[in-house]
Amino acid sequence: MDIIEELRAYREKDIPYSRVLSSMCTVPHPVAVEAHRMFIETNLGDPGIFRGTVELEAKLMRLIGDILHCETPAGYICSGGTEANIQGIRAARNVQKKENPNIVIPKTAHFSFEKIGDILGVKIKRAGVDEEYKVDVGQVEDLMDENTVAIVGIAGTTELGQIDPIVELSKLAEERQVELHVDAAFGGLVIPFMDNPYPFDFQNRGVSSITIDPHKMGMATIPAGGIIFRNESYLRALEVETPYLTSKTQFTLTGTRPGTGVASAYAVLKSLGFEGMREVVKNCLKNTRILVEEMRDLGFEPVIEPVMNVVSFRTDEAERIKEELYRMRWVISTIREPKAIRFVVMPHVTEEVIKNFISDFRKVLRR
């Protein structure tokens, strides 16, 4: 067998995005693919060699900074939301310099914070949520103590797409003089382009850092996560010496770092512009409403009215439904609390995809 044929055979075992209604990633935009090819051999881990790519990343940081209302953005493109969350909390720990550091997170926070506790030696405290699944700010405050280095808010929770009360968390962070990290891995490139955007970003003075992933709603090629700090002082807190490279210090978590994510993210945001991104988000929200209407017709109610293009529907048969759909090569996910089936309506989830899905979903319900 020819090696390319062998590769194709393996690739064909993958499920195409047209059958995937659970992923927060999507088919890359054509301009992202073109940019990826152009920068395929670049390594931002050696900035003295790839000077143009370094300059491009700086431009991308300013572009994202504009979206997030930050005049002095400092950060970089990384592997994804997990790495970005690690770096946000690592910077907070290093800046705060407390002996037995802890952070307070919502119980709805991404599982990457489990890894953060293990890797950074930071104690994780979990605050409960209200009836709308937003973090309870009162509980956050009660859990804080003299060793708290950061509190965390989510702008687009993984399971429900909910936005925590970042404005109130920001005021609390300022009052208690701790850092506020906002995990907007998903919502960071959704909320700014909505009709009535919630102020989740650096316009709140207490926000220190934001996770934002262009390889999600930014339609960049994978990997293209992002961590953005309010200013460079947080990057300085992450630096280690790199004596044998073309730069003396490095603030990133990984050494070797592809420039493809930078190029593809910049290409999409620059070519589409603000209005183009608004159109992408508008279309995803429209299709989310279509999905909700179809599911309601079948007797399924959303856990909460969708805030963005993530929606979960209550059912005690979540696991059975997921497994039967998977046998039909449809991919959805489930959540445990409350029991529900979960959907993410990405750009590839078109009205036609929803129609095809509902047709097969009806067959599952008849079994």
From Swiss-Prot:
InterPro entries on file: GrpII_AminoAcid_Decarb, MfnA, PyrdxlP-dep_de-COase, PyrdxlP-dep_Trfase, PyrdxlP-dep_Trfase_major, PyrdxlP-dep_Trfase_small, Pyridoxal-P_BS
UniProt-listed PROSITE patterns: DDC_GAD_HDC_YDC
Associated pathway: Cofactor biosynthesis; coenzyme A biosynthesis
Superkingdom field: Archaea
Modified residues (N6-(pyridoxal phosphate)lysine): K216
Keywords in alphabetical order: Decarboxylase, Lyase, Pyridoxal phosphate
GO biological process: carboxylic acid metabolic process; coenzyme A biosynthetic process
Keyword Lyase: yes
NCBIfam families to which the protein is assigned, alphabetical: tyr_de_CO2_Arch (TIGR03812)
Family statement drawn from the similarity comment of this UniProt entry: Belongs to the group II decarboxylase family. MfnA subfamily.
Biological function: Catalyzes the decarboxylation of L-aspartate to produce beta-alanine.
Protein name: Probable L-aspartate decarboxylase
Organism: Archaeoglobus fulgidus (strain ATCC 49558 / DSM 4304 / JCM 9628 / NBRC 100126 / VC-16)
